Amino acid sequence: MGLLSTVLAVGVNLQTHTPVSEVSSTPDSEGYAAVKTERGILRAKKVVYATNAYTAALLPDFEGKIIPVRGICGHIVPTEKPTRSLSNSYIIRQGALEYDYLIPRQDGSIIVGGARSRYFHDKNNWYQNVQDDELIESAESYFDGYMQRMFRGWEESDASTAKVWTGSK
């Protein structure tokens, strides 16, 4: 039995895609916190915050303690030309603070993240930045031709970047 099944079986009310705008700082007379959401106010004896980069927005005590940083990832898709498949996840370290990571998918595509050398010099692009709705422009093309540059046996492949996105952690 998975974790989700286990917690639902004991009555946990798991809310997903439900932004919380406020949590009461003191419980009511029955020991419940009021959790204000777009769906209404929920009552909870325990609240678990799973917010990563956005923690300080709900918990001001964490301002300056949890600092959001932005990164960039790409989805590389091989074409019909034969390529060597990757059977493991990889970290490619190019310097002390410069590395990329690759996660092969079952369909032969690859998730790759990194590109730090393209944006690290401009702190506003990544430090204390939660702008997930816009790409880091200076790194947007980093994954183009990545497999051809980095892996033997991929030089003649037509593997290309299908998608690029950014995220905060």
Question: Which residue stretches match the model-derived regions?
Answer:
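Residues that flank catalytic or metal-binding motifs in active/ligand-binding sites
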Residues: 16, 31, 70-72, 98
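Short, solvent-exposed loop/turn segments at secondary-structure junctions
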Residues: 21, 54, 117-119
